């Protein structure tokens, strides 16, 4: 996890503009650098480093002797950089995984570069020889990227929007800042003046298609066919491979553990592989919740079963409520369920940073979207519509769960790794017949659970534990975290304010006091930027006025039984 920032064609003094880059210093607590581009007094790169791979030679922008005209600033991890070196005979100057981007670009251009990378990334690549600037972001947007581009060619790029919103420019004091779309690259011409012109924005691959880099994957070709045993075996092999490749790190590895299926599978496979690879230190797992919350109790069972060094972070309602404003500032969103779920993740990340030496943190994000884990999937009209909904959720991950996971961990200088969003794993899972992927026997993620049923990785009660939203599982069964928040907020927002909410906030108007409260805080820090959230996250096919799983009938009936 690092923070990247760059300006091209600035009309203002760069030494003043660079102050904006310090707003993302939390993403890279180990070192930072600002560097002007040769021959351009109005172009600059900024970089905040979290040293995870090649701690000695990993500063950016990356430049190598072989390609003196290329400048690279990137945030991410390229898991197949060694395989690509062997495949194409690249001669690396450093041990930095991102150096492969320079070699791939020199060999085949930007489209081949983006398509061949197995990993998570957001990058800015400058080619001064051909006067080109390239931006690119990974398939699911696991690594964030924002940009601002004015009509007269001023370009600003940053890992988080907060590093761009206060930039000054002659034609606009507050230029429009937008997220860069996942799975795309952009080509821009660099003029002698330092200004840029956008040439094209291209989607370089789809999450449904098997990635080009699969050809040199260590797993090789999988057995074909959709009989159940073959499918289950392929799921296990690909998921284990997804975890294995993410073990690439020179810093200590830990794992978030809620006691739910997803994080428990990640932790169990992770610890198994660490033993096989003879990694000497114990795996630290981290659970958070209020006293005796379902997540804490379940996580203890998992930790005892797999033998991890387990840490529990217990918080009370006051601590959670006090964190709301910090969380919204970090998130750069006002989405209801995202804010709720982020508070626990933010607090546990804070604990990890202060109390442990784990820096690379594994988590279970992406599984609910991929494997149809949300409660409302039980109400899908058909397997085909459930499959379409799964794809929609994956497409929008960068607005919700992936955003939450990145910002809450990066706020405390941690790097998150999400094996469920491994591109080869997701493309295979999405290629399966729709009827195989739907909930069965009243149980969501049925196929995923089946695939690991005979592995002994987890206790049976954890493998088949019903879905519970993270923001619900961290509180008690009797009173959920969202109810605690709503009770507090009810005293902070009066009825009259809510009645006039649509007048004050015509875009995505708040319809509840809780929503209004979050929106107020968001507008305080990011006034006029409400379009960053195109819509609120809400379940489909059900009559729901709140995104919490505990408001859904299926959930209530399961609890009563």
Curated annotation (Swiss-Prot):
Query: What UniProt keywords apply to this chain's record, in alphabetical order?
Result: Amino-acid biosynthesis, Asparagine biosynthesis, ATP-binding, Glutamine amidotransferase, Ligase, Nucleotide-binding
Where in the sequence is the active site?
2 (for gatase activity)
* Enzyme Commission number: 6.3.5.4
Q: Which organism is it from?
A: Gallus gallus
Gene Ontology MF term list: asparagine synthase (glutamine-hydrolyzing) activity; ATP binding
Pathway stated in the Swiss-Prot or TrEMBL entry? Amino-acid biosynthesis; L-asparagine biosynthesis; L-asparagine from L-aspartate (L-Gln route): step 1/1
Q: Which residues bind L-glutamine?
A: 49-53, 75-77, 97
Matches recorded under SUPFAM superfamilies? Adenine nucleotide alpha hydrolases-like (SSF52402), N-terminal nucleophile aminohydrolases (Ntn hydrolases) (SSF56235)
Report domain Asparagine synthetase positions: 213-536
* Gene expressing this chain: ASNS
- What catalytic activity is recorded? L-aspartate + L-glutamine + ATP + H2O = L-asparagine + L-glutamate + AMP + diphosphate + H(+)
Gene3D superfamilies in alphabetical order: Glutamine Phosphoribosylpyrophosphate, subunit 1, domain 1, HUPs
Give the Pfam families listed for this entry: Asn_synthase, GATase_7
Question: What are its GO biological-process terms?
Answer: asparagine biosynthetic process; cellular response to glucose starvation; L-asparagine biosynthetic process; negative regulation of apoptotic process; positive regulation of mitotic cell cycle
| NCBIfam families, alphabetized | asn_synth_AEB (TIGR01536)
- Give the record's GO CC terms: cytosol
Which residue intervals define the domain Glutamine amidotransferase type-2 in the entry?
A: 2-191
Instruction: Site Important for beta-aspartyl-AMP intermediate formation: list residues.
Output: 365
Where ATP is bound, by residue?
256, 288, 363-364
Write the protein's name. Answer: Asparagine synthetase [glutamine-hydrolyzing]
Q: What is the lineage of its organism?
A: Eukaryota, Metazoa, Chordata, Craniata, Vertebrata
What the entry lists under InterPro entries is as follows: Asn_synth_AEB (IPR006426), Asn_synthase (IPR001962), Asn_Synthetase (IPR050795), AsnB_N (IPR033738), GATase_2_dom (IPR017932), Ntn_hydrolases_N (IPR029055), Rossmann-like_a/b/a_fold (IPR014729)
């Amino acid at each position: 996890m690092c923070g990247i920032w760059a300006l091209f064609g600035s009309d203002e003094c760069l030494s003043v503009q660079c102050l904006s880059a310090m707003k993302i210093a939390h993403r890279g607590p180990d070192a930072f650098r600002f560097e002007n581009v040769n021959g351009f007094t109005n172009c600059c790169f900024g970089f905040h480093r979290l040293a995870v791979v090649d701690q000695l030679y990993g500063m950016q922008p990356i430049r190598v002797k072989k390609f003196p005209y290329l400048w690279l600033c990137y945030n991410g991890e390229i898991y197949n950089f060694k395989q690509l070196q062997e495949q194409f005979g690249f001669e690396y100057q450093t041990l930095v995984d991102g150096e492969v981007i320079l070699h791939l670009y020199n060999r085949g251009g930007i489209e081949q570069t983006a398509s061949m990378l197995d990993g998570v990334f957001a990058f800015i690549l400058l080619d001064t020889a051909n006067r080109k600037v390239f931006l690119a972001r990974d398939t699911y947007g696991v690594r964030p990227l924002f940009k601002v581009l004015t009509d007269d060619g001023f370009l600003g790029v940053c890992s988080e929007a907060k590093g761009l919103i206060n930039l000054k420019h002659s034609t606009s004091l507050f230029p429009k800042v937008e997220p860069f779309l996942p799975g795309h690259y952009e080509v821009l011409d660099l003029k002698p003046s330092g200004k840029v012109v956008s040439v094209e924005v291209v989607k370089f691959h789809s999450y449904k298609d098997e990635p080009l880099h699969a050809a040199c994957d260590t797993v090789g070709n999988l057995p074909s066919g959709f009989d159940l045993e073959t499918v289950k075996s392929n799921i296990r092999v690909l998921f284990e491979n997804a975890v294995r490749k993410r073990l690439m790190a020179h810093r200590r590895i830990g794992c978030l553990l809620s006691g739910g299926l997803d994080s428990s599978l990640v932790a169990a496979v992770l610890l198994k592989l660490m033993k096989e690879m003879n990694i000497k230190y114990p795996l630290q797992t981290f659970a958070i919740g209020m006293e005796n919350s379902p997540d804490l109790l379940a996580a203890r069972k998992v930790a005892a079963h797999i033998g991890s060094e387990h840490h529990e972070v217990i918080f009370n309602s006051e601590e959670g409520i006090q964190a709301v404003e910090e969380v919204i500032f970090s998130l750069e969103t006002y989405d209801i369920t995202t804010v709720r779920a982020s508070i626990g993740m933010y607090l546990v990340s804070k604990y990890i940073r202060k109390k442990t030496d784990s820096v690379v943190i594994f988590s279970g994000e992406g599984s609910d979207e991929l494997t149809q884990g949300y409660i409302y999937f039980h109400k899908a009209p058909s397997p085909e519509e459930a499959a379409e909904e799964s794809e929609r959720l994956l497409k929008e991950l960068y607005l919700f769960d992936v955003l939450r996971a990145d910002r809450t961990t990066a706020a405390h200088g941690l790097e998150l790794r999400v094996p469920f969003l491994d591109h080869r794993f997701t493309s295979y899972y999405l290629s399966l017949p729709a009827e195989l992927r739907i909930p069965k026997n009243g149980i969501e993620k049925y196929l995923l659970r089946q695939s690991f049923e005979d592995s002994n990785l987890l206790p049976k009660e954890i493998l088949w534990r019903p879905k519970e939203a993270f923001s619900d599982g961290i509180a008690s069964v009797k009173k959920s975290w969202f109810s605690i928040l709503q009770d507090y907020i009810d005293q902070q927002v009066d009825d009259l304010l809510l009645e006039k909410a649509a007048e004050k906030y015509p875009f995505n108007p708040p319809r509840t006091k809780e929503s209004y409260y979050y929106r107020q805080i968001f507008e305080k820090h990011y006034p006029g930027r409400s379009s960053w959230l195109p819509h609120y996250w809400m379940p489909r096919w059900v009559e729901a006025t709140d995104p919490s799983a505990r408001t859904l009938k299926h959930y209530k009936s399961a609890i009563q039984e």
